[in-house]
């Protein structure tokens, strides 16, 4: 053990990826970060058992949904007859977003013949079979799956509570020289606490400024008031669903893709300062 003296401490430990046991024919987000998607998918499509080709995507959050539609588009380009399905533990997809996201996405899945298994838990993979369990009855299900791709989301540790200035609270008392930012924090303020890059970056910039202010002009700290700018989930290269400005104004299709570019441009500007 070692003790370090500090003037200010910033905790920004974030969230961990949910980890599942790796098995044959199973991929996750890290695999796609390390290799091109086509390199990962083509071995399945080039197999001789055309009638048995099937891909299972596990996880109906934003990442899983965006990969699901990109994979469907890739299969269409390759004129593949491989079947595609989504496994999700919840009743609806994109449950963290406003109502309307789920119905639009699920209607597009139906149009594209993507099978949907809601309220279903992933148990594992054995060779070319995915092992599932029905959420309410615990009934075990086995389906053919030549490739299973896991997008299990983030696992948030017990978050640190903070006041509106980003100072950690212990028994409702702020620690003046210890700040927290990112996904591991919940601010007691009107600002957004969603687990998104937007919120994490804005909290980080705020506490950086507040540390400088506190070290020079005690008491003149800035509160965290930033709302979400918007959020767009892409559904392939020609479709999307999202909102910007107000959560009640749902936008779909090509206009939503345009908004996605605007939101990402705003995020890039935010990172640039």
Residue positions per predicted region:
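FAD-site-proximal beta/loop scaffold in flavoenzymes
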Residues: 28-51, 142-205
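N-terminal Rossmann-like NAD(P) cofactor-binding module of classical short-chain dehydrogenase/reductase
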Residues: 10-11, 149
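A Rossmann-like FAD-binding core segment of flavoenzymes
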Residues: 76-165
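C-terminal, flexible cofactor-proximal segment of oxidoreductases
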Residues: 199, 203-273
């Amino acid at each position: 053990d070692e003790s370090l003296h500090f003037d200010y401490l910033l905790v920004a430990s974030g969230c961990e990826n949910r980890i599942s046991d790796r098995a044959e024919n199973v991929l996750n987000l890290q695999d796609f970060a390390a290799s091109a998607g086509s390199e990962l998918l083509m071995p399945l499509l080039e197999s001789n058992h055309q009638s048995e080709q099937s891909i299972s995507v596990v996880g109906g959050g934003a990442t899983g949904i965006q990969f699901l539609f990109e994979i469907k588009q890739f299969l269409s380009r390759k004129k593949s007859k491989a079947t595609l399905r989504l496994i999700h533990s919840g009743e609806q997809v994109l449950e963290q977003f406003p109502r309307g996201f789920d119905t639009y996405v699920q209607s597009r899945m139906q149009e594209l013949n993507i099978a949907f298994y809601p309220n279903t838990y992933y148990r594992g993979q054995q060779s070319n079979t995915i092992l599932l369990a029905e959420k309410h009855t615990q009934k075990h299900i086995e389906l053919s799956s030549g490739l299973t791709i896991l997008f299990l989301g983030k696992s948030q540790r017990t978050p640190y509570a903070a006041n509106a200035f980003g100072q950690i609270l212990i028994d409702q008392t702020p620690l003046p020289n210890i700040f927290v930012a990112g996904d591991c924090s919940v601010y007691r303020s009107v600002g957004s606490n969603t687990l998104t890059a937007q919120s994490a970056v804005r909290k980080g910039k705020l506490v950086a400024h507040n540390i400088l202010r506190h070290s020079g002009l005690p008491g003149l700290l800035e509160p965290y008031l930033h709302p979400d700018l918007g959020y767009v989930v892409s559904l392939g290269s020609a479709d999307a669903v999202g909102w910007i400005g107000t959560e009640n104004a749902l936008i779909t299709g090509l206009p939503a893709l345009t908004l996605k570019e605007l939101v990402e441009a705003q995020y890039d500007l935010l990172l640039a300062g």
